[in-house]
């Protein structure tokens, strides 16, 4: 007999987009029924915004390459995580990952990473040339 245990859990916020206007819209009941609605998991829910560190180290910039790009012709969300992982210590045991996506990077854009190691977390900001983040990632070893 198997005991039901969670290996991982996640919380995400999505937008329902009208494909004709490109603008967010309220989903109709038929749209929601396709995915189903369940009770929220009993997990800690963090705020939507990641607190930016006061001090960061600038790391070496790199270009967005073809393998980062998805079918929407911008960097795939999981690629931002892969980029950030390159700057973490090899022995880091990640217990919690939070990602705040700010704007889409496209092929040829330069990524300017910033790193901050604090007592309880590591924050990686993946920024454009004006230091505006494409994505902010927060890694914790303990929840």
Please provide the spans of the model-predicted regions.
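HotDog/MaoC-like acyl-thioester-processing domains
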Residues: 3-49, 105-107, 116-143
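Hot-dog-fold acyl-thioester-processing enzymes
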Residues: 18-91
């Amino acid at each position: 007999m198997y005991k039901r245990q969670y290996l991982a859990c996640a919380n995400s916020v999505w937008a329902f987009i009208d494909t004709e206007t490109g603008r967010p819209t309220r989903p109709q009941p038929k749209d929601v029924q396709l995915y189903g609605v369940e009770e929220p998991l009993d997990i800690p829910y963090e705020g939507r915004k990641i607190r930016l560190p006061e001090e960061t180290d600038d790391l070496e910039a790199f270009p967005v390459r073809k393998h980062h790009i998805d079918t929407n012709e911008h960097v795939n969300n999981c690629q931002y995580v892969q980029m950030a992982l390159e700057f973490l210590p090899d022995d880091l045991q990640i217990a919690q990952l939070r990602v705040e996506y700010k704007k889409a990077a496209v092929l040829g854009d330069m990524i300017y990473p910033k790193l901050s190691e604090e007592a309880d977390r590591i924050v990686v900001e993946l920024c454009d040339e004006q230091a505006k983040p494409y994505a902010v990632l927060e890694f914790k070893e303990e929840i």
